[in-house]
Regions:
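Positively charged n-region of N-terminal signal peptides that target proteins for export
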Residues: 1-6
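Bacterial N-terminal signal peptides
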Residues: 7-16
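Repeat-solenoid scaffold signature
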Residues: 168-213, 266
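Flexible loop/turn segments at secondary-structure boundaries
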Residues: 86-87, 111-112, 140-143, 169-170, ...
Length: 350
């Protein structure tokens, strides 16, 4: 970290001597992060969208290069590091480490924080006063010279729970699950999902419209362990539908983990065991949803409401095409053996 800070300061000094002012937008090729930073390359979104990998492009027919998604990502250093001092624009590390700067782009995390506060179940790290850069490193932000295809790729991220929580209490849950479950599987309270993302509205009007859903969390495999995950659904031209599942850390963490009965032999498990589960449905014109822990199992039909968005209104699609399902972020569904273990009743022990 010290070497990264030293290098960063050197860059600042060089820029100052060269009279490169932030009053003019700094070109990305003048900034050391261009070669590998996911903030700049946007590789993750493009990689999973690609039709060659069974991505959303397979039903939209629109190349990623034609989408505006890539334009939201960081094109130059000054997007994060620009600040005003004495009426002049200056380079600032303080501006870049301000949490509000991160939340300008990371809207899902901002939404999760608001939901947590509304429910009175704030994230333990947020309550403790931690901010994004207390966990996420400069290498993650600026890259290290390696071109990662996704933030989920091994080696792309430094942050993990064990960096701070090196001593784990010897509870029954930890003894049984520690080698098989990631911390997030039990300690993430919920995730917020974007459902019914309307692709045509995004392309034609440049607007992102979707129906947010929270109060649940999914389980899938990632890096050899079961972890928390999320889902997202899309509607494209011709009433084509799409569903993705991916590992996700929602920044909604509780000190107390899940109880055994929150995951084992639940109503959700029983639905899934029968081959289908209703994730969302309509009740009096209002979208309702499942809640709790939802295992991701291949071959199961996860039913969801699909709607068209026209003139500012959602209209249910009478007979939507069965959604194509994609597992992204290097996540994989639970195996049959793993799911069968979830079907066994377990009671929490003190």
């Amino acid at each position: 970290m010290k070497s990264a800070i030293t290098f960063l300061l050197t860059v600042v000094i060089v820029l100052s001597i060269s009279d490169v002012a932030f009053s003019q937008k700094t070109a990305a090729d003048q900034c050391f992060f261009k070669a590998s930073s996911l903030h700049f390359t946007v590789s993750g979104m493009e990689y999973w969208y690609d039709k060659a990998r069974g991505g959303l492009e397979s039903i939209t027919g629109v190349p990623y290069s034609d989408l505006g998604c890539k334009n939201c990502h960081i094109a130059a250093c000054d997007v994060c590091h620009k600040a005003e001092q004495d009426g002049k624009l200056v380079y600032s590390n303080e501006a870049a480490t301000n949490q509000d700067m991160c939340l300008k782009c990371h809207a899902r995390e901002a939404s999760m924080m608001k939901i947590n506060e509304k429910l009175g179940t704030p994230d333990v790290h947020h309550t403790a006063g931690l901010k994004c850069t207390d966990c996420h490193t400069a290498r993650e932000m600026h890259g290290d010279g390696t071109k990662y295809i996704s933030m989920k790729q091994e080696g792309a991220m430094d942050v993990n729970c064990e960096q701070c929580h090196d001593k784990i209490t010897k509870s029954i849950s930890h003894i049984i699950h520690r080698s098989k479950l990631d911390c997030k599987a039990c300690h993430v309270q919920q995730v917020v999902s974007c459902t019914n993302c309307h692709f045509e509205t995004m392309v034609k009007e440049g607007k992102r419209v979707a129906i947010p859903v929270s109060g649940w969390s999914f389980l899938m495999n990632y890096n050899g362990k079961v972890t928390s995950a999320n889902m997202q659904t899309f509607v494209a031209s011709g009433n084509k539908t799409f569903m993705i599942f991916a590992p996700q850390f929602s920044h909604s963490v509780s000190k107390e983990g899940k109880k055994c009965e929150d995951c084992h032999n639940t109503a959700n498990d029983k639905e899934i065991d029968n081959g289908a589960m209703n994730l969302t449905w309509l009740d009096g014109g209002e979208v309702k949803q499942a809640s709790g822990i939802i295992p991701v199992v291949d071959g199961v039909l996860y039913n969801s409401v699909f709607q068209n968005y026209e003139s500012g209104k959602w209209t249910p699609i009478a007979d939507p095409v069965k959604p194509k399902v994609q597992y992204v972020g290097f996540g994989t569904p639970l195996s049959e053996k793993q799911f069968k273990k979830l079907l066994k009743s377990q009671k929490s022990q003190k």
